[in-house]
Amino acid sequence: MFLGPWPFSRLLSWFAISSRLSGQHGLTSSKFLRYLCLLALLPLIWWGQALPYKIGVIGPWTCDPFFSKALPEVAAALAIERISRDMSFDRSYSFEYVILNEDCQTSKALTSFISHQQMASGFVGPANPGYCEAASLLGNSWDKGIFSWACVNHELDNKHSYPTFSRTLPSPIRVLVTVMKYFQWAHAGVISSDEDIWVHTANQVSSALRSHGLPVGVVLTSGQDSRSIQKALQQIRQADRIRIIIMCMHSALIGGETQTHFLELAHDLKMTDGTYVFVPYDVLLYSLPYKHSPYQVLRNNQKLREAYDAVLTITVESHEKTFYEAFTEAAAGGEIPEKLDSHQVSPLFGTIYNSIYFIAQAMSNALKENGQASAASLTRHSRNMQFYGFNQLIRTDSNGNGISEYVILDTNGKEWELRGTYTVDMETELLRFRGTPIHFPGGRPTSADAKCWFAQGKICQGGIDPALAMMVCFALLLALLSINGFAYFIRRRINKIQLIKGPNRILLTLEDVTFINPHFGSKRGSRASVSFQIISEVQSGRSPRLSFSSGSLTPATYENSNIAIYQGDWVWLKKFPPGDFGDIKSIKSSASDVFEMMKDLRHENVNPLLGFFYDSGMFAIVSEFCSRRSLEDILTQDDVKLDWMFKSSLLLDLIKGMKYLHHREFIHGRLKSRNCVVDGRFVLKVTDYGFNNILEMLRLSEEEPSEEELLWTAPELLRAPGGIRLGSFAGDVYSFAIIMQEVMVRGAPFCMMDLSAKEVIDRLKMPPPVYRPVVSPEFAPPECLQLMKQCWAEAAEQRPTFDEIFNQFKTFNKGKKTNIIDSMLRMLEQYSSNLEDLIRERTEELEIEKQKTEKLLTQMLPPSVAESLKKGCTVEPEGFDLVTLYFSDIVGFTTISAMSEPIEVVDLLNDLYTLFDAIIGSHDVYKVETIGDAYMVASGLPKRNGSRHAAEIANMSLDILSSVGTFKMRHMPEVPVRIRIGLHTGPVVAGVVGLTMPRYCLFGDTVNTASRMESTGLPYRIHVSLSTVTILRTLSEGYEVELRGRTELKGKGTEETFWLVGKKGFTKPLPVPPPVGKDGQVGHGLQPAEIAAFQRRKAERQLVRNKP
């Protein structure tokens, strides 16, 4: 922002008054200094205010009722209001408007325009094309922009002569000529009403059409009376070969009476039978509603409706909504007075609105670009604009020309609704059919002017005889086709031989290469050994075998691998994006020059091109495979130690390769550390060159690169459209500087900056300040840092060439030349030392992981079974004569689950079974599995323990029952957890079942019986079968057993069972079981009182949590 002339003059006046006051009234020096301080602060106060920009809206608002219907003041106020709310605009200026009246007489209109000089900063208008040139020259002299929607003269588009003139709509003549070209209507007639504004419009239109080489037969003016109109129509009929009649007057659809009488009399004279096409001119200046907008004037006037069949209405295309819908929506939103009827408002309202928005958009662009708001700057920054206007999309091209779309409307002479037939695309100046054909009177279009060539600046005139011209053209075409066909046949044969046959063939297929999929282990030598085996097989004449052992190579296809074997060597395939490549011949003919150039590149530091793979719809560059992979991979491997000597060797290799490419006039365009590969001898080679050239030659599209991919791209290429794909020599030098930063710090580009890749790219695009990586002097010699800064200079012309870089870099190693052999030996020595430490470290890690794995395996399977599975042996099922099984579950678990959240149920089971697992660790038992709330344990297997299995299970059961007596649920501490336990002794068979997640399972009737003992037990009770009690009694260890009586076991009948209630010497407290009813049973769930108490406490806690 700058200090404007008005505030500055006021400050000077204030300073002069202060000086006089100091002289007349003896103003002291201290007081005068205070005045000076105030004077210094005034600009700062002014600095924070937005400058006013007043837009003068010029038109014949008072002398022409049709223009007054456009409601210019309402349109301007609405536009200014919306601009003030649009936060995308620059706020340095605030917009105001003033409605300036234009006299209907052109001479007086120019005089009034001159009087408006001081009333506005820029003008929307004039509406009268008659003084557009004069107004534009005055605007240039006043440095005030002229933004017109009505000016016709194409010379106004010359920005050198009229630098402050802009069109807010496409030139109406361009639109007319585009339509006339399409239908080949060259001969035109122009007629206007007798208002001065339309007379001058007609003269300007005729002159503009003639400048395009189109003959304008008549230019007529007619009054509203029938006699005057009939005279004009007779003159048109007498003129030679007129096809199209352009009517410069107010449209009949919005109440233009002159046009209505003109069309009615033309219909009476049979001139609307298809001989002529009538085109209203004024609708080119606004968007005439047509979707769901029937016109009553056509409905009520049958003669006009029939005549309108010969009229083509060309108007600005509306998109999401019509003018009427947009106006009604604004009225409903309170933006304009609701009392206004949209159908009584001229659609020119939207054009005025769009023109003001146009100025605001240009102003915002100019301020964002250079902070200047001069008239010429606004015109320059009205290019490549796009915004949604009142009800249509407003667009301009790179020259500032409007490219908004138009639509051709038509009726069939019977209906009173307009239909869209063609879209006029002003960007391509072509017509697009919309699916509804034009209904021409008589069923066929108006005859075309076949002898006119529509050449710019050439007069349309007669040519040679059409029949003779057709015969000559046909003969020439036939001869040309014959010669081309023969040449194409010969060339096709030659190309076919060169492409796929012979030792110098370029295109390879699946018959030439064998795809492989290497899996790299921890040792680099594993891949090398396999590669020598493959190469030896290929060289001996045998096909390489792809049934490689695990960890070496596995079969692959072109779809999932980039590595293949070609002529015994490993090769790398750089795949192109999927696309329509055509056949082999079309590829060769369209990009043969690039192919040959890339094939001929031979240098030690350039990865050689071996050919191009093309098969099964895939196209790829085939180059040598480098075993050390890319420079980026080496830099990211912390295990590899790189001293400065070795880093400088890699950089010098890169410089040599790029120097060679630039000498061959070859721009890389994609240079980055991952496109620099290192072979087995630690020689760096540049690869992926020519990729962009082939994309351009084959016209292939590519996905937009990510911000991370653009970190190597020069700023000027980031800012230029298409620059990223094309590249430049200076851009390659910038990319080399970023690679230097990577090598010096062994980090990604801009890794020292605490910004995302997108933020870095945004700063690179929009300097100042110039944004670059910061490299500490400790990473490289000072002269290398200085060279890097020269290479990434903001001005491309200030960057050195690779010849200059090479001359500087080769002497950086303290005056000695870089010796790659010494660097390799030193690096190999470091690598050997690092490898020993790495092996030792990896061995220790492997041993720790092995112990963890074995521990986990023994927790899942018995140790003996786990050892057998580790050795690869089959685990045979094993029978055990006597084992004791333990089953338990939670009483009322279903009720507890229904009253708990799922995570609370998981916490309950985890806490309880963790407690059980701790107990069974002190007993000779084996935990078989847990299913839900069921817990299964066995003793006597997989390791036999004689008769101790019953005692071990009994002791464990007492311990578990004792611990459960004091166990509390975290979420329901008031509710007791009761379990029931069942024990049974008998024979079982054990074995491993399944291959995926193998399990050690028990089988036999003993398992079912033990489960029945648990399910028929009671809470806080250990239910024991007779077989278990018998063994316990033989052990004589003091187990206390009570007879329960005969119990019904499902599937077993009635058997005598017992309760295990204690053991001599067992002092741990056992929970008191619930009393047994008269039927000998208790409830197998929570008591109703317990459930009610828990629900009550839960509701109380919920109320406490919800209380504010």
Curated annotation (Swiss-Prot):
This is Retinal guanylyl cyclase 2. Residues 532-812 form the Protein kinase domain. Homodimer. Interacts with RD3; promotes the exit of GUCY2F from the endoplasmic reticulum and its trafficking to the photoreceptor outer segments. One of its GO terms (cellular component) is plasma membrane. The gene is Gucy2f. Residues 491-1108 are cytoplasmic. One of its GO terms (biological process) is cGMP biosynthetic process. Belongs to the adenylyl cyclase class-4/guanylyl cyclase family. Residues 884-1014 form the Guanylate cyclase domain. The chain crosses the membrane at residues 466-490. It comes from Rattus norvegicus. Responsible for the synthesis of cyclic GMP (cGMP) in rods and cones of photoreceptors. Plays an essential role in phototransduction, by mediating cGMP replenishment. May also participate in the trafficking of membrane-asociated proteins to the photoreceptor outer segment membrane. Activated by GUCA1B when free calcium ions concentration is low, and inhibited by GUCA1B when free calcium ions concentration is high. Inhibited by RD3. Expressed only in the eye. The keyword Acyltransferase does not apply. There are 9 conserved cysteine residues in sensory guanylate cyclases, 6 in the extracellular domain, which may be involved in intra- or interchain disulfide bonds. GO terms for molecular function: ATP binding; GTP binding; guanylate cyclase activity; identical protein binding; peptide receptor activity; protein kinase activity; protein-containing complex binding. It is found in: Membrane; Photoreceptor outer segment membrane. Keywords: Cell projection, cGMP biosynthesis, Disulfide bond, GTP-binding, Lyase, Membrane, Nucleotide-binding, Sensory transduction, Signal, Transmembrane, Transmembrane helix, Vision. Its EC number is 4.6.1.2. It comes from the Eukaryota. Its main location: membrane. Disulfide bonds join 104-132. Pfam families: ANF_receptor (PF01094), Guanylate_cyc (PF00211), HNOBA (PF07701), PK_Tyr_Ser-Thr (PF07714). It is a single-pass type I membrane protein. InterPro entries: A/G_cyclase (IPR001054), A/G_cyclase_CS (IPR018297), ANF_lig-bd_rcpt (IPR001828), Cyclic_nucleotide_synthase (IPR050401), HNOB_dom_associated (IPR011645), Kinase-like_dom_sf (IPR011009), Nucleotide_cyclase (IPR029787), Peripla_BP_I (IPR028082). Residues 1-50 form the signal peptide.
